[in-house]
Every structure is written in C-alpha cells, then in structure tokens.
Amino acid sequence: MNIKMMLLCLASTSCWAQKDSVNSLSVDLNFLSHGEVCGGGLPKPDDKDDYTEDRSSFLFGRTRLIVDYGRKGLQAHAVIQNSAIWGMKGNQALNLYEGWVKMTAKNGLFAQLGRVALSYDDERIIGTNDFATAALSHDILRVGYEGHGHQAHAILAYNQNGESVYSNTYYVNGAQYYKNMQTVWYHYDVPTIPLGASLLFMNIGQQSGDPADAYHHPSTKYQQMFGGYLNYHPKFLTLEASYYRQTGNQVDKYMGYIPIRAWMASAKATVKPSECYDVELGYDHLSGDDYIPVNYGGLNMVRHEVIRGFSPLYGSRTKFYGIMDFFYESAYSNGFTPGLQNAFAGANYKPFDKFTCSATYHYLAVTTKLHELDRTLGHSIEIQARYQFSKGISLSAGYTQMHGTETMARLKQDDSSKLAHWGWFSLVVSPSLFTTKW
C-alpha cells in the first residue's frame, strides 16, 4: 500500500512539474544550398568588349544556427548566419542575422529590442527578401499593442558606422541603409467581414558626405513613405490592393539632395475554386523619372531636378516584379528609373500534399513617356516547383525566360536580340537539434 502511494505521488509530482514548466529552449539549424545559371539582360561593363558573353553560373550556401528561448512575458531569438559562394576564399559573410528580446504584457502591450527581420503586410515595402543571399534585417526598437483585431507598431532605428565621441556619422556604406528611421504601422481585422486594412508611415534619414573630407560636415536628408494595404478574402476569393507615396529628399553626392515625388499602386485578385489549384491576375504601376535621351553605347549619367522614380525600399521585390528582378536590383545604365508597369497572370497547382508548382506570365513596360521608343520592355514567363521530401527537407526549382525589346536594350544597354534566361534550384534542410522545457 505504501509503495502504491509513493508511486502515485511521484507520478502526480512529475505531471505537475511538466504542467508547471515556464521556460522553453530550442536550437535549430537551417541549411540552404542554392544554384543559378543565367544569361542575357544585363548591361555590358565599360571595360569589356562587344564579344564578352553575358552568362554565369554559381553555387551558393547559407547556414543558420537558430536559438529560441521563451517564458511567460519574455522571448529571446538569435540567428547566426554564414553565407558564401562555393569556392570563395575569405570574405565569407558571417554575421548575426537576428538577435532580439521581446517583452509582452498581459494587456497586449509589447517592447522588442535588437536586430529583427521585419515583415509587414505583403512585404512590398518592408520584407525579409529571403530569396536574396543574406536577406534583410534591421537594428531597431519596436513597441506596440496587439489585441482585439488591432495591431499598432512604432519602430525606431539609429545607426552608426562605429563608436565615436567626436562625431555621429553614418554613411551609405554601413551595415544598414539609413542613418535613422521612424516607422508607424497600424492594422485592423474587421470582425464582421473578412477584411484587413493597414496603414504605414516611414521617415528615413540618409547621411551624405565624405568621411575623408574634414571641411564638409555630413548632412542628413529625410524621405517619407506613406500609404495603405487592403486584403479582402471571402470564400474562394482574395482581393488585394495597395497605394504608397514617396516624398522628401534623396541624398546626392554632387547636389547634396534631390526632391522626391513618386508613387505606386497595385491590385491583385486570386480565385481558389479548390484546394488543388488557384489562379491570379494583377497589375502594378510604379512611377518613373522624366525621360532624358541618351546616346546608345555611352554612360551619359542623367541628373534630375526631381526624382519621380518610385523605390520599393526594403521590400521583397522578387515576389512582385518578376523573380529575375531586372528593374530594381540592377540599375538602368544611364542612372534613372523609368518606372514599371507589371501586368501579370498565373496559376498554382498542388496535385498532392508534398508537391506544388506554378506558372506566371508578366507583361513589363515603363511608365515614363519615352522619345522615339515604345514603352514595352518585354515579356516574361516563370515556372516554379517545390517538393517537400519530409519535415524540414524541401527542394525548389524554377526557370524564367524573358524576351526584351529595343526599349529594354536602349535603357539597359544590353542586347535585346537574344532571350534572357535564368534557372535556379534551392535545397533547404532544417533539422531540429534540441528542444527542452523546465
């Protein structure tokens, strides 16, 4: 009888201890192996002759060590990241991709401090851009409230190139893209209908100047981004729309600053008749700079009195304007942005649980009126597929082909007579190493 009572007490104590566990710790790994083969579509470098081939292939690896700690009211998260091209000697990018602590109160208030991978709405303006080799993160303080369908966030950032008691300089070659940044984001989910709405305001300070020039002190210029995003998703249908404006001033090495007057709008509809497939249709319009003719084959850098070319800032561009990202990742040869019209249609198909595939067509054109040139840049077709082997192991692959026009050749200083193509694959392995609670 005494033995039975002791066993019962031990069992109940064990259950109580498991129920009362307040701390959790997990350690995970994430391996990404990525390969690309591409050709065509890029400007010819000035130091290359006309016979230089525009093609390349490479393999890339990224490893992440992910540590998570949590208890009631407190979270801590760290991601150490190494990324490099296979065969590269030295200069491998080993950094802290994320490292933050977050404190949460019972009433929904929270404060988060550290290096954070930010993602808002559809990631058009602020996203992780995880398809890129190193992805994006920001050193910030974020405070806010979340509850009852409301989300309100305020973000503050202040960056330095290094510790100094003599100056407060931060130039554009720093780890981040700005000297300081203030952002306010608000989102509301309507309880009676499947509608979500967001508002965003950003104030971004960029510093100009020459660190070696003691006579010209650094100057910080500010630009603003503000707008909204809507998502309406009744049964079988999702409607999305966004509109943003850019104002303020852009840092310029020679002129000090240039005023910004730019805007963008987008709309997208997705119909999902079944769990196996969906179709989508959409249009993006990004404003462009005034056109100034340039001579074919020369740089002829253009200086505008007003910047009218919209910049997606810190968004995940490959999600929207074609996965090759011809138009914002690689600059136009004469230094101006002619804007972009992107009309697209696509379909996603999931024949069984572990496999998905998609195909998308893009019609691409500039928004700026050009002299003696048509606005059409070209036509692009993208095919992608993904197979989930097991939990934490997946393989993705894709192929894109674009046929550029004479307009594309003139603005990018490339050869429009040949097809631009890009093939890629990504193998992701994410094992969970350790999980415990106490």
Question: Each predicted region: which residue ranges?
Answer:
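Outer-membrane beta-barrel translocator domains and adjoining extracellular loop/strand segments
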Residues: 39-46, 87-94, 123-130, 164-173, ...
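Outer membrane beta-barrel
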Residues: 56-163, 187-191, 269-315
